[in-house]
Amino acid sequence: MKQTILSISLLAFISTQSMWYDKQPIEQPIAIDTLLMAVMAVESNFDTMAYNEKENAAGVLQIRPIMVREVNRLLDKDKYTLKDRWNKAKSIEMFNVIRSHTKNPTNERIARNWNGGWNGHKKKSTLKYWQKIKQQIK
């Protein structure tokens, strides 16, 4: 009985993991655009040395360790390190990995997922963040 429950729980967990992101990224170059500029403005005011000690978020895009791990997981290799969060170009690459794996990508979904994880687009806590991003895009 325990094994059946565990198997069902594991199956449910695995099936929800792919609901909000595409396992295969969109194969197209993604340039720096208004969304990325808005996210950098909101996250750090374009400061590559910005650091939020409370969240251990670093760099121009305020990347936390969990995001580095997630990007590496999506790429299926350890391409990025925590040190790369301080590098603007590598931070942008990580943002673009997340963006390219976002299912049904819109600026809102990408921004809210960047702020709140793969289910960020459904969290009330990311609405205020999205409003800040929209103000920057205007």
Describe each region flagged by the PLM.
Residues 31-47, 95, 109-118:
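Short, functionally critical alpha-helical segments immediately adjacent to catalytic or ligand/cofactor-binding
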Residues 38-77:
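Secreted/periplasmic proteins that engage bacterial cell-wall peptidoglycan
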Residues 4-14:
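Sec-dependent N-terminal signal peptides
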Residues 29-32, 54, 105-107:
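Extracellular/periplasmic catalytic domains that process cell-envelope and extracellular macromolecules
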Residues 14-21:
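C-terminal segment of classical bacterial N-terminal signal peptides
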Residues 21-28:
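Extracytoplasmic and endomembrane cell-envelope/extracellular-matrix remodeling and assembly machinery
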Residues 65-122, 130-138:
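Alpha-helical segment that forms one wall of the substrate-binding/catalytic cleft
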Residues 48-49, 121-124:
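Extracytoplasmic/secreted cell-surface and envelope-processing proteins
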